[in-house]
Amino acid sequence: MTDKKRFPIQEVSKIAEKESWRKEINRPIYHIHKWWAQRLGSVFRAILLQLMVDQDTDVWDAFYKIHDFSDVTVLDPFMGSGTTIGEALKLGANAVGCDINPISSFLVQQELTHVPYQELMDTYEMLERKVAPEILSYYKTLDLKSGSEIPVLYY
């Protein structure tokens, strides 16, 4: 149960307001797919912290610190876009989530699966080699002065 007196509502509200303006930029991991009622990561981090830290710990002081709650397991049986699961993992807790909608389960699994950096870059470079020439062919225009075809950089 959360304690209203310990919850840093003023501080979290300021962060949450900014996060809510452009969720897909501020917390892109939870926005790989359109989802109903996406929750703000900053709010859920604060809620989870309040539930996990000692009663005498200031939740706001703990907000930006690195934590190891490996002795805690968080269950979210209605995980939706996975905000609770993602924030619990960031806090070093174990997390278990499920949802009646299989798309939710698939999306959250993809969001939270670690991809080795080199594998990601190799795949990106392969895609660039294979499809970039065709895609770039659609981004050309005629230079009004010279009449020659030039690449379009900005619209």
Question: Which positions does each model-derived feature cover?
Answer:
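S-adenosyl-L-methionine-dependent nucleic acid methyltransferase catalytic domains
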Residues: 1-155
